[in-house]
Design a protein with these regions (language model features):
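Aromatic (Trp/Tyr/Phe) and Gly/Pro-enriched flexible surface segments
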Residues: 148-269, 273, 287-298, 303-378
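Terminal processing/anchoring signals of secreted or surface-associated proteins
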Residues: 72, 274, 456-459, 475, ...
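Extended, low-complexity, turn-rich repeat/linker tracts enriched in Gly/Pro/Ser/Thr and Asp/Glu
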Residues: 78-80, 278-288, 300-303
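Residue-level detector of functionally pivotal "anchor" positions at catalytic/ligand-binding pockets or at interdomain
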Residues: 378-385, 453-477
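Edge beta-strand at a domain terminus
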Residues: 35-41, 54, 88-98, 128-155, ...
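C-terminal tail/sorting-segment detector
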Residues: 19, 454, 486-502
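Beta-rich interaction/scaffold domains
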Residues: 378-456
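Bacterial Sec-dependent N-terminal signal peptides
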Residues: 1-39, 475
Length: 502
């Protein structure tokens, strides 16, 4: 929680924080001509707690020297019930081409009067009409994180906000069910609970409850279900596929908050994590498990369970059909995504949580608590090679190398990554290769610099500058032979000779 214990500086020094951000704006410099403006969701967190979640605009402008500037317009955050207006923050950034997209990166210490150097770390992706950006500011022991753009996490996946229907915002249960039997199925099946998971910084989770439904002369168990799509009650037979959760980006229906019955997704996550606490009201040996499912699709109609005989356009799925009774304890689950069709571009995700993995099974008093659901994007590099030659002694956290090879281009560089959708941008200029590697959600990145030495047999010509060049036996150019060893000297006529420095 963001309270007195961990927010002494941020809350007690309100004016200091205002001065910090205001001075930051001035220190980064003012730029007036902007090429493109993006509007989207801006989320600001301090030490893990969300302080602001609103619509904002960011401008991106190309400068005369080829660099870019990101301008966060009219930046403000909510602090202790007050709106803190910061102004416009401008961040110069270096561009890296990435297919039809562009990555923008900055990592610099900003000197601010009376505050010293404040580190700012930026990584953004500009693709078509969308911008996604991560900005990290470390100030006085606080981690301030600014995320712009959606499409990489499920909104309200920490279950902190609930609407008038009692459903968590951007999630839907039987309160908003549709279909032939909607009137019989409607109930408060998913509600807020204060039983948060251990270590949570939030105040609530979601409680999903099953119940019995009476149909004339018989009754059925209605599994408690929550989804990012919408529930359809189309049959009195529980196992019928007409009873489902579904999404369709073409569907124009809105819930009571004005939100659609779907969640858009642009990312390629590696796993789904969530905290659960599950209790069967009446133990069932044949049907003991709750379930959690997430399916990434191209945004066309999709439902769970799938209707037999129909083909759906799905890219990946993460499924756990064996969530056992946790005996009153919280348990963290990590469910890997299985990519079934990588050729499909991600457009939407359908997450469905239910008190039983089998339709109509379990009891009418089962309870599934869920907290802090998250899409995880792996980050890591296993190796880098140039023209098929692996970098010698490669270590993931070592970022500078020298590699002897003939003339190389960016296409000659291969990077083996650990994440499903990791981003790799490469440039080669003036004998130096730069490789920018990032997680698919931009939350982590690393820059590798490789001095691409040509070797003794491939020394570059110096006819243009008429100067003598000095190389080590490894092919690395140096300013002078000031240490013991063997050097290769190349004169203005292109002639070379070996020199031994004693």
């Amino acid at each position: 929680m963001f309270n007195k214990a961990n927010s002494i500086t941020f809350v007690a020094n309100y004016n200091s924080m205002k001065r910090f951000f205001t001075t930051l704006f001035v220190a980064l410099g003012a730029f007036t001509a902007f090429a493109k403006s993006y509007t989207g969701r801006l989320v600001v967190t301090v030490n893990g707690e969300t302080l602001s979640n609103k619509t904002a605009s960011i401008d991106v402008d190309q400068q005369g020297d080829g660099s870019y500037t990101l301008s966060l317009k009219n930046f403000s955050i909510s602090l202790s019930g007050q709106e803190l207006n910061i102004g416009t923050i401008n961040i110069p950034a270096t561009p890296y081409a990435l297919g039809n997209a562009r990555l923008l990166q900055a990592n610099r210490n900003v000197p601010i009067s009376s505050l010293g150097n404040v580190p700012i770390n930026l990584l953004a992706q500009e693709s078509g009409d969308k911008l996604h950006a991560n900005i990290d500011i470390n100030f006085n022991g606080m981690t301030i994180k600014v995320v712009f753009g959606e499409g990489y996490q499920v909104p309200n996946s920490n279950f902190e906000t609930f609407g008038e229907s009692k459903e968590p915002n951007r999630w839907h249960s039987f309160q908003s069910v549709t279909g032939r039997f909607a009137s019989s199925a409607q109930t408060d099946a998913a509600i807020s609970s204060d039983q948060t998971r251990p270590g949570s910084t939030g105040k609530s989770c979601v409680l999903i409850k099953s119940r019995e439904l009476d149909f004339f002369f018989f009754s059925v168990i209605a599994n408690g279900t929550l989804t990012t799509g919408r529930l359809n009650a189309g049959s009195s037979t529980a196992s019928n596929a007409k009873n489902n959760s579904f999404l369709d980006l073409a569907n124009k229906d809105k819930d009571g908050n004005g939100d659609p019955f779907y969640t858009e997704l642009s990312g390629r996550p590696d796993s789904l994590t969530l905290w659960v606490k599950f209790k069967q009201g009446k133990p069932s040996a044949d049907h003991p498990y709750a379930t959690a499912k997430a399916v990434i699709t191209d945004g066309t109609y999709y439902q769970l369970p799938e209707e037999k005989g129909k083909t759906y356009k799905k890219m990946a799925e993460a499924i756990n059909n064996e969530i056992a009774d946790t005996k009153g304890e919280w348990k963290r689950l990590s469910i890997p995504f299985n990519y079934v069709n990588n050729s499909i571009a991600p457009k939407a995700i359908l997450v469905t949580l239910s008190t039983n993995a089998d339709a109509g099974k379990g009891s009418g008093s089962d309870e599934l608590y869920v907290d802090d659901l998250e899409l995880v994007y792996n980050f890591g590099v296993e190796g880098i090679s140039i023209k098929g030659q692996a970098l010698a002694n490669f270590a993931e956290n070592t970022t500078e190398y020298t590699h002897i090879v003939g003339n190389a281009t960016a296409d000659d560089i291969m990077v083996k990554t650990k994440g499903q959708g990791m981003l790799v941008a490469k440039t080669v200029e003036n004998g130096k290769a730069t490789v920018l590697v990032a997680s698919n959600d931009l939350s982590k990145y690393r820059l590798y610099t490789i001095n691409v030495a040509t070797g003794i047999d491939n020394l570059p010509s110096v006819e243009a500058n008429k100067q003598v060049e000095i190389y080590t036996l490894d092919g690395v150019r140096v300013n002078k032979a000031d240490r013991k060893g063997v050097y290769i000297i190349k004169d203005a006529q292109g002639k070379t000779r070996k020199v031994v420095k004693q």
